[in-house]
Amino acid sequence: GSTDETWIHLLRWKEKDSRIILLNQRNAGVSAARNAGLDAARGLYVGFADPDDYMDPEMYSRLFSAALEYDADIVECGNHVFEDSSDRLIEAKRRSPSRHFEENASPASFFRDSIWGKMDICVWSKLFRKSMLDAHRLRFNVNLKSGAEDETFRLMAVPHASRLLFIPDCLYYYRLMRNGSLSRRCNVPTYSKCVQEFQRLLYIVDYWQKQGWQNEGLFAYGVRKIRPFFVSKHPLFHQMTAVQQRSALNLWKLFYQKAEGERFLSALAGRDRQLADLLNSAEPVPNGWGRILLAACSLLPGQKGRYYSCKKMLAEHFSQVCPNGFQKENASLEEPFDTSPPSL
């Protein structure tokens, strides 16, 4: 699906190595390309590399050897990060996990001590057992936009794997701050990205429920993912229109319900529990000293100030737009959005 001269270079490589199989299709995004590769793959393991990064020439052979040695369902290596402009390695961002093997991983350990809860969100540093992906019909969701497909695939695939392996070797080189890269373009927070994040979370929750995996770890993960939209140095919620704010809050309510937030609320860390409570119980702007105190607290530095700033914004929205509270059945979106999980 490339629109440049990539195909010409691939033909030259195929002339040098007959094992290379070329696939050509209309450019439909990275997920469609990966799915085409998965459908055509016939090997024991499969891997996915981003087009503007590079890797150690022995990366896949070393991952493959390690996977065979441990009979692993998924094996992951470490990675370097380098600057796009200078090729300088950024040591602070280097990821080198300790060698570890777990032969009985379980989604019940999500975000606790299990190895799979600590795995990197990206797919490019891993090999996946092909038969495992096929057995569970796992493919990338073509309805999700750039930046969401890797993490979504990981959260669908890894819980199916029971034998997980880390090797400490840094064999992948991830390009940072690349002007034309997909990851750079998707890092800018927007209302559409907020909606997309909720859509992704609802999709994952639905998938986990069907597998019988639902637990507090997934709910905590969701709260942590949406936190920057509400509580950060420059929260997107403050920049939304009133209709967009109401849409975001309605989506939160839907996620809270589907992820069984009431059941798992007590398991959240302190600030995440505060945010969940805040989003669930917004009240109108208080009168008198209460109004003054809320305004003053919103100016405090750090996390506390951001929390009160969000509380103040929610109170103002509640007073002006939704005096009767946020009700899903009365929700309206500034742009069409289907809250049902997209199909594979």
Region locations from a protein language model:
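A conserved acidic beta->alpha catalytic loop
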Residues: 1-8, 50
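Short, conserved active-site loop motifs that form the nucleotide-linked donor/cofactor pocket
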Residues: 19-21
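Glycine-rich, basic loop-to-helix element that forms the pyrophosphate-binding segment
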Residues: 25-41
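Donor-binding/catalytic cores of nucleotide-activated saccharide
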Residues: 30, 51-168, 172-191
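Short aromatic/hydrophobic "clamp" motif used to bind/position activated sugar donors
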Residues: 46
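Membrane-interface aromatic/basic loop that binds lipid-linked glycans or pyrophosphate carriers
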Residues: 72, 235-344
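Catalytic core of nucleotide-sugar-dependent glycosyltransferases
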Residues: 169-178, 184-211, 229-263
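Amphipathic alpha-helical repeat scaffolds of TPR domains
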Residues: 220-232
